[in-house]
Design a protein with these regions (language model features):
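Extracytoplasmic copper-binding redox domains, predominantly the cupredoxin/blue-copper superfamily
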Residues: 17-226
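Sec-dependent signal peptide recognition
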Residues: 1-8
């Protein structure tokens, strides 16, 4: 009986952990430490992904939320809640896409099939922007205003902790990567300081590489668009 009891418990999976931490911005140009993405990549093999479906709203001439994190294979909906036409596009290497022009009360969707950082804009409104961070892992979080983040149900193992901040250079972010060893229970990762020093913000252009017009054509077809 004792042997069977021990054998039964030996095949039970190890309990998952809750991993948390804080990210602090230095040399920040904008108040608040929210909107940074933190994720864990297993050092051995790849974690099983469950693609999701999330929403990036267009309302009051803004994308909301401004920063979105999704696992590879996820679908993002871009509903237009404004009484004017909108568009969503990206020419960046993460995954270029273009929804075309679409009317108020309608929506477009994009499936993000590869990891990367996707900077999203509207081809009509130059002030509209967002970032979609597509990660190769189910273990990720977006920081709150105080820089805090938390991930639940992380299996025990060795991971590489990685970060994304839209106003930090790749060199800065690469230097902050660290090995994290997760066991069961709670794990608090040491505070990470991210500097915005060295990042140069350049005004973006339309999907055709042109300057935005001084006054957008919001209520109908526009030159050069779909």
């Amino acid at each position: 009986m004792i042997f069977r009891w021990l054998t039964f418990f030996s095949v039970l999976p190890a309990m998952a952990a809750t991993v948390s931490g804080t990210v602090e911005l230095t040399d920040a140009k904008v108040k608040g430490w929210d909107g940074l993405v933190v994720w864990l990549e297993p050092l051995q093999g790849r974690a099983a992904l469950t693609p999701g479906r999330v929403v990036l709203d267009q309302k009051n001439k803004k994308f909301s939320p401004h920063v979105l994190a999704v696992p590879v294979g996820s679908t993002v909906d871009f509903p237009n809640h404004d009484p004017i036409f909108h568009n969503a596009f990206s020419n960046f290497a993460g995954q270029p896409f273009d929804t075309g022009l679409y009317a108020p009360g309608t929506s477009q969707k994009v499936v993000f099939r590869r990891e990367g950082f996707v900077r999203v804009f509207c081809n009509i409104h130059a002030n509209m922007s967002a970032v979609i961070v597509v990660v190769p892992t189910p273990y990720y979080a977006v920081t709150l205003a105080n820089g805090g983040w938390q991930m639940a149900n992380v299996p025990p193992g060795e991971y590489r902790l990685r970060l994304f901040h839209e106003r930090a250079t790749q060199e800065t972010l690469g230097g902050l990567e660290m090995k994290v060893v997760v066991s069961d229970g709670m794990l608090t990762v040491p505070r990470v300081k991210v500097s915005e020093s060295g990042y140069l913000e350049v005004p973006h252009k339309t999907k055709h590489g042109r300057e935005y017009p001084a006054k957008p054509q919001e209520n109908g077809p526009y030159i050069g668009g779909k």
